[in-house]
A protein has these predicted regions:
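Structural recognition of an alpha-helix C-terminal capping motif at a helix-to-coil junction
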Residues: 31, 45-52, 65-77
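A short, charge-rich alpha-helical start-of-domain segment used by transcription regulators
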Residues: 7-30
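Arg/Lys-rich amphipathic alpha helix in sigma70-family domain 2
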Residues: 59-63, 73-93
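Internal acidic/polar
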Residues: 81, 88-111, 116
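Amphipathic, Lys/Arg- and hydrophobic-enriched alpha-helical face
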Residues: 22-40, 57, 118
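Sigma70-family region 2
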Residues: 11-12, 48-66, 85-86
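A short pre-motif secondary-structure segment
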Residues: 128-132
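Short amphipathic alpha-helical boundary/capping segments
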Residues: 5-10, 113-121
């Protein structure tokens, strides 16, 4: 069945079509939630909320661009919405050195290690990091997203 037909059936609340869309895209979308979340449990909550939003708004997809890109944007916006109303970034008042030297061999850094470091950042810092470094948004765009 074509993706366009699946999308239209999802808009009509066809459960089989929704299940097929879920099976096609759940892996990629969960990885997005994982990178924006503190831990796996929070990622699962964000993932579930994101898919609910996708299926609620799927009728708004206009077939002008990539459906996968649209779903990624909905998923990221769902996660960001949860964090927008949280406390603002705390400004660090202690002296911060101009340069920090870290001596780590590139071969020693694993993907799990990096993911763990990112997940341990405070919520808003993690959001900014992901949006800037991983998704390529400008600081101006990020500022608008987080307002």
């Amino acid at each position: 069945m074509s993706l366009k037909k699946l999308i239209k059936q999802c808009a009509d609340n066809d459960r089989k079509a929704q299940e097929e869309i879920y099976q096609l895209f759940s892996g990629k979308l969960f990885s997005i939630c994982l990178k924006y979340s503190k831990n796996k449990q929070e990622a699962q909550d964000n993932f579930q909320d994101g898919f609910v939003t996708i299926f609620e708004k799927i009728g708004q997809f206009k077939f002008n661009g990539s459906f996968e890109g649209w779903m990624k944007r909905v998923m990221i916006n769902t996660v960001l919405l949860k964090y927008r109303n949280k406390t603002v970034l705390n400004i660090v008042t202690e002296d911060i050195p101009d340069e920090v030297i870290v001596d780590i061999d590139d071969d020693e850094i694993s993907l799990d290690f990096l993911l763990n470091l990112i997940q341990n950042l405070p919520d808003r810092y993690r959001m900014v990091f992901n949006l800037y470094v991983l998704d390529g948004h400008s600081h101006k765009e990020i500022s608008k997203m987080l307002q």
